[in-house]
């Protein structure tokens, strides 16, 4: 089924391209077959793990599957279509009723297996496991106070306005350097809350945890963070975003990680997802 699905998509989009050969000498048809094989293995591993961990469908899950079946019937053979007509439609696409049920059941079980292994938010991942994941992928955590050099529409400020922003940044840096080192972290947090113009502060109030050196942040910011030790504060760092004063932090399992989603997740959860993906 998976092979047919891929083949149907490719031929509809690009015509008969299955014999096209990649640079390593493998035809597109062979690549599609390998992808299909991978999906088959993945689905059966999930099924085995569900059985091994006693993960079963709930009544709510079954209700979701029943709704999915009805929706698929209506979208495939019409609002007045029957299950029999729907299964005839599937048969033309190399799908048996058993395969249809199996695939949909696995889709519903997938997140339940994750929760059984790691907890809903990765809480079963230990601190040591989360920090080992951070070390393996070079995660770093940093806060910054940003003075933007563009307006809300993205238009660059004038040279005079930029100079004023830099002077403001210098005044804040001087204030930080004027207090004993033991007091700087607390003062940094106060000044970040009062002075920073970073729109991401509301989502990441305790700093950004990200994969250092991977292009997640602008290079000037990233280079500055990687040059600091935890607890150290940078000088004024200029980037396309503006002027930054950066403080590197110790990485903790509860740091919010930048995963390219609108929803922030903890490092602990990110470690769980990475481990889960490596298995499945």
Task: Indicate where each model-derived feature is located.
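PPIase-associated folding chaperone regions across multiple families
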Residues: 85-164, 216-280
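Surface-exposed patches in mature extracellular/periplasmic domains of secreted proteins
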Residues: 52-62, 183-194, 234-237
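Short amphipathic alpha-helical segments that mediate assembly, nucleic-acid/protein binding
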Residues: 83-86, 130, 169, 184
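Surface-exposed intrinsically disordered loops and tails
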Residues: 10-11, 15-20, 213-219, 226
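Short, well-structured beta-strand/strand-turn elements
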Residues: 56-61, 124-127, 199-202
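Second-shell loop/turn segments in exported
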Residues: 23-37, 46-56, 71, 95-100, ...
